[in-house]
């Protein structure tokens, strides 16, 4: 493996790219009927708007491969270069007893095994701490060779279910009901623990990093998820380096890395598309009803709403938002307009898609730099293919070594 750039150099390159081009990735096509950058790149905008919904879906997960007008190819090449990161080395997958996989969905089981295979530390962990553990599936997998295990979870039903599973499987585990954001959460963490978090959201994994540093945990492993699940409207950088950046991120901005979807089934995709097309059709209607050409946020709606006809959907949503009642509308035309806008939105979002991974790496490096500033040696890389989960980045940290490494292809 060739020597990799330092964490700082990687962060600075990503920061320059994201800052310079933020006018391309910050505006959201779903909210804005026209995007500011369309005036600068009319050929690209017209080309994208003329494409079908199926075209957009085909390019969604690999937007960089799209042969689009300038400046798309140049941006795609830079984004691809900045996003290069290799998988972390894996140990031979252990033979996992069928009983150990009790109650674990297949995809989650594979994620757990891939995550566990990458946890190489100088010191053999003696006590695993499964953060936001759910039923403790990850912790039990890691502690199968006899290490101690503590599982922290706020949902009492999951705590009880996990405790029963551990007892049934003969795993010596302590399952505790704990709100990890509460002021007493630090009492559960000790320097001898090896904390692990597989897809802990936003504030939850940030809290773990902060407490692990405060408690001087010797080593830890975190695969972040849902960076936008934070309390504050504005993102508060964790490291001194990110704090000095001119890039000021909102909670909405943090949702960009999560827009990649590879695990949804056909039915889920159909429902998602219908929901978005109907919302966009309603958006056209509400602008007319309010006589204001601006987006109106609407709440998440139960799936039963999609079983209404479109006219009833719009009437009921207008009532919910306390808007004037719709009059005589051409409902089929309005619904068609919603589907047409969805095709345009999805294709315009391909520009934002070029910045998904760079922004995710910027956020991951902010976390890594925080740990490096506190004396940790940090390794970053993927732990599984993106087809298994798009959130496949893993941060490994060990206290007391000056070296750092971002795993990149040779």
Locate each region found by the language model.
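Conserved SAM-binding motif I beta-strand of class I
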Residues: 148-153
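Conserved SAM-binding loop
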Residues: 162-163
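Conserved SAM-binding strand-loop segment of SAM-dependent methyltransferases
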Residues: 170-180
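Conserved Class I S-adenosyl-L-methionine-dependent methyltransferase catalytic core
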Residues: 38-120
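Conserved SAM-binding loop of SAM-dependent methyltransferases across substrates and taxa
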Residues: 135-146
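Class I S-adenosyl-L-methionine
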Residues: 2-39, 181, 187-410
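Conserved class I S-adenosyl-L-methionine
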Residues: 125-134
